[in-house]
Every structure is written in structure tokens, then in C-alpha cells.
């Protein structure tokens, strides 16, 4: 899984291969690669 960091809250998110960047594993907030 590609580990990235969310720009807003600074938490980590993962790219589960579904074309979505998920923050906190909730897949509700789009993360930006930092």
C-alpha cells in the first residue's frame, strides 16, 4: 500500500488500489501526496 500523508490533519492514509486516497481508512477524505 502506498503510504501518504493528509495535508489537513497530518494523519496517514493509504492507497488501497481502488484509485482513491483514503484518510484514516475511512475513504471519505481525499489525501494529497506530501
From Swiss-Prot:
The keyword Disulfide bond applies. Disulfide bonds join 6-23, 13-27, 22-31. One of its GO terms (molecular function) is toxin activity. Signal peptide: none annotated. One of its GO terms (cellular component) is extracellular region. It is found in: Secreted. It comes from the Eukaryota. Probable toxin from a worm-hunter cone snail. Shows an excitatory activity on a majority of mouse lumbar dorsal root ganglion (DRG) neurons. Very probably inhibits the inactivation of voltage-gated sodium channels (Nav). The presence of a 'disulfide through disulfide knot' structurally defines this protein as a knottin. This is Delta-conotoxin AtVIA. It comes from Conus ateralbus.
Amino acid at each position: 500500500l502506498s503510504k501518504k500523508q493528509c495535508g489537513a490533519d497530518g494523519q496517514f492514509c493509504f492507497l488501497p488500489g481502488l484509485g482513491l486516497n483514503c484518510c484514516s481508512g475511512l475513504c471519505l477524505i481525499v489525501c494529497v501526496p506530501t
